[in-house]
Amino acid sequence: MKKFLSLVIAAMAICPSVFAAEVAEAEAAAEAAPQQSTVEKILAKMPKVSGYLQTGWNYTSNDKATSSSFQAKRLRLIVDGNVGSKVSFRLQIEAFNGIAGSTNGNGQKNIQVMDAFATWAPLDAFKIRAGQFYTPLGYENSDISPATLETVDFSNIVYRMACRNPYEYNLVDYGRDLGVMFMGDVGDSGKGFKYFHYDVALTNGSIPCKDDTNKSKDIYLSATIRPFKNFNIKGTFNWGEYTSTKLAGGTGAASTVEGAANKYNPMTRCVVGAWYNDPNGIDIRGEYGFMNSKVKGEKVVEERGAYALVGYHAGKWLPVIRWDMYKDNINPLSANNYNRILLGCTFQPIANVKVPLNYGLSLYNKDVETALGYNKHHQIQLMGLFKF
């Protein structure tokens, strides 16, 4: 009888602990896999809306003129969504488009469609993009956006090479084009990055949202090699044939040789660069680019550009210094022939807010000084960028 009572007491002592363990395991499982509500499931399938506003103050000064103005610089609305398990789309709209020739009749900025493309991604190594998208010409046109750029403005490699076509669109646009692009990432490092990325694109070549003016198509060949995590080397080559076009914002380049039809003018662009960026340390990037066109032996386009940027991520602060230059050998007396030094610092108090302060000094040679009436140009930019 004593043995029986002892067994009963032992069983009663063990049962609560076993039951408690089972309850704890069940609760842990419930916490690890919470079930989505119907509303959450619907929201998860809806397109994601994001964007940013960049606004602030801009001051410029030279020996002939001075300006001071608050600016509505950029207002981007971005919509990302999924058409299926392997097909996504993006729509990006710029609501403060102030490009010369594209403002309304009163000189006000208007709305411009920037991105409108779909991407099919069956594999990491092979993806197809179709629609209007950013071309892979240089880091600042495809790997960086105004929201992630270390300064307020890009270098002229972007503005005058990637965002401009001297023949068909001789003013600065947004570096987009209509066409199809094949891309992919290969060579898994096992450390969270791939060793090689490629882009191969066929586009109209006119840059903005326009049909092609001839039967020829632009070709882009781009490769990025990443030997280790924070460093990569990129090179992009572009070739196309273009029609000389006159627009409200700028007259296209044209050959003066007798008999030149100016409908299939060949032009090449090339940009190469290297970038090391430690999110908690130093940021170093440099690029060199050129753009050439020759028609019946005549040089119609011959431009060169380069920049070097050094910055340091110090918590909420990012101080930078950038040198950049540009040379237009066809128009040697224009303000696009310069050397420029930029000093800047960006304060980021929270993840979605950036406040960059930039000072830029542009220097011109004697020939440009004679044409412009001044040999240097100052600029101060204080901007706030607010993401949502």
What are these regions (language model features)?
Residues M12-A13, A95, Y139, G297:
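Alpha-helical transmembrane segments and their juxtamembrane interfaces
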Residues F4-Q54, Y59, F388:
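N-terminal periplasmic/intermembrane-space "pro-region" immediately following the signal or transit peptide
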Residues T38-G205, T213-Y220, T224-I233, L309-V320, ...:
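Outer membrane beta-barrel
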Residues C15-P16, G98, S145, Y364:
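Residues in and immediately flanking transmembrane alpha helices
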Residues V23-E27, I42, S61-A65, G84, ...:
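Outer-membrane beta-barrel pore domains
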